[in-house]
């Protein structure tokens, strides 16, 4: 098995730069988030994690960008269904939200050469036909949205992959891990791990911080969520969700979400205590969660802000952020932090009843966590094997 190089000096630089000295705001930082203690390795120098991506949609492309720039990962192969190499290069290079890729992208036959790194591309529909073993892929980002159970993803394992990470909530009881919240739950015991959803990643770090200190008796979550590719450009048809069939760019659309309930998968102490809903709004990236909850112990709003800031600068750095500046959604575009608490937006009715607000880039932030989870899984596997 191939291992990856330790890049401690880069992690130190990332940690040092994560907060602007003149502000409490966490700025955009396209560097690996600080890994939890459970993911740290000791021993000999390692090589980059050999990675592959199945599916080249919004998340697949952004995970690819992040992997190419991260020395802890080596992207070997992307399977993109029917997309030609030329079109894949175009999709990779240009992005309406995150801008033009800052680097070289060259097509060489069926391969992409990105910043001098060769990435094999394939166009198989069935996982058993992709050929991961031929390129040495060991850790796979399953990003098609189709193979989201252990049974459906098993052909990836049969084809030579060691572990499959779902970039979406699993549709079975596969292990769910939110980095910065329950990374220690992975001990090498399974081949299939879900990174949950972007909204669960945006909510869970805040829930953990608050529940650890004061306890949460009950809570309601609302996510004000940017448009996604599942929505209609103009009024269309949706038998399952009539409102969801309306034009995304011209409406605020109430919708359902399982993100709040899913937090219980990574924080069992809040099982049965949280639920939520979504409003889909006409913006193309960045979302915000509103957590209204009843606390088990008294807390002033100032105490809550201080605790979130402490954790954001401490053991949850890279996953939980803090800002006390008057920011808006576009200020969080291409922000890698999972969840940035907005101290100026929240309110408190009394010491037990509070409304807390946190921003998240539902594309870039989540894609960083998918990459982080793949690296974490590889580190744990290496430690278990050793």
Curated annotation (Swiss-Prot):
Primary location group: plastid
Subcellular location: Plastid, Chloroplast
Catalytic activity line of the entry: D-glyceraldehyde 3-phosphate + phosphate + NADP(+) = (2R)-3-phospho-glyceroyl phosphate + NADPH + H(+); D-glyceraldehyde 3-phosphate + phosphate + NAD(+) = (2R)-3-phospho-glyceroyl phosphate + NADH + H(+)
Transit peptide: 1-45
Gene Ontology cellular component annotations, sorted alphabetically: chloroplast; cytosol
Pathway: Carbohydrate biosynthesis; Calvin cycle
MF-aspect GO terms: glyceraldehyde-3-phosphate dehydrogenase (NAD+) (phosphorylating) activity; glyceraldehyde-3-phosphate dehydrogenase (NADP+) (phosphorylating) activity; NAD binding; NADP binding
PROSITE patterns: GAPDH
Record keywords, A-Z: Calvin cycle, Chloroplast, NAD, NADP, Oxidoreductase, Plastid, Transit peptide
Binding site for NADP(+): 58-59, 125, 362
Keyword Plastid among UniProt keywords: yes
Broad EC category: oxidoreductase
Superkingdom of the source species: Eukaryota
Binding residues for D-glyceraldehyde 3-phosphate: 197-199, 228, 257-258, 280
Quaternary structure and interacting proteins, as annotated: Homotetramer.
Family that this chain belongs to: Belongs to the glyceraldehyde-3-phosphate dehydrogenase family.
Protein known as: Glyceraldehyde-3-phosphate dehydrogenase, chloroplastic
Naturally occurring in which organism (per UniProt): Guillardia theta (Cryptophyte)
Gene assigned in the entry: GAPC1
């Amino acid at each position: 098995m191939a291992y990856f190089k330790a890049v401690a000096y880069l992690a130190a630089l990332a940690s040092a730069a994560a907060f602007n000295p003149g502000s409490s705001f966490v700025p955009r930082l396209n560097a690996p988030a600080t890994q939890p203690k459970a993911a740290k390795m000791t021993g000999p120098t390692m090589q980059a994690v050999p990675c592959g991506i199945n599916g080249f949609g919004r998340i697949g492309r952004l995970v690819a960008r992040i992997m190419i720039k991260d020395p802890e990962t080596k992207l070997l192969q992307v399977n993109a269904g029917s997309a030609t190499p030329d079109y894949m290069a175009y999709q990779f290079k240009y992005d309406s939200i995150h801008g033009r890729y800052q680097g070289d992208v060259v097509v060489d036959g069926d391969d992409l050469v990105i910043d001098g790194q060769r990435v094999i591309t394939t166009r198989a529909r069935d996982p058993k036909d992709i050929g991961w073993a031929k390129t040495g892929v060991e850790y796979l980002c399953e990003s098609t949205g189709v193979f989201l159970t252990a049974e459906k993803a098993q052909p990836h394992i049969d084809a030579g992959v060691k572990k499959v990470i779902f970039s979406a909530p699993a549709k079975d009881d596969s292990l769910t891990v939110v980095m910065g919240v329950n990374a220690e739950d992975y001990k090498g015991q399974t081949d299939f791990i879900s990174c949950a959803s972007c909204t669960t990643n945006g909510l869970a770090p805040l829930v953990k911080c608050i529940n650890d200190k004061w306890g949460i008796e009950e809570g309601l979550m609302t996510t004000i969520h940017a448009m996604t590719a599942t929505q209609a450009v103009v009024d269309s048809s949706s038998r399952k969700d009539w409102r969801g069939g309306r034009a995304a760019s011209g409406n605020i659309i109430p919708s359902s979400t399982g993100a709040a309930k899913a937090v219980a998968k990574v924080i069992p102490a809040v099982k049965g205590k949280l639920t939520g809903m979504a409003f889909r709004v006409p913006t193309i990236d960045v979302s915000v969660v509103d957590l209204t909850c009843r606390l088990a112990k008294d807390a002033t709003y100032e105490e809550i802000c201080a605790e979130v800031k402490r954790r954001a600068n401490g053991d949850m750095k890279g996953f939980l952020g803090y800002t006390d500046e008057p920011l808006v959604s576009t200020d969080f575009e291409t922000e890698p932090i999972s969840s940035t608490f907005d101290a100026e937006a929240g309110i408190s009715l009394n010491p037990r009843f509070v409304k807390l607000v946190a921003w998240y880039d539902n594309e870039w932030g989540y894609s960083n966590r998918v990459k982080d989870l793949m690296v974490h899984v590889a580190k744990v596997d290496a430690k278990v094997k050793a």
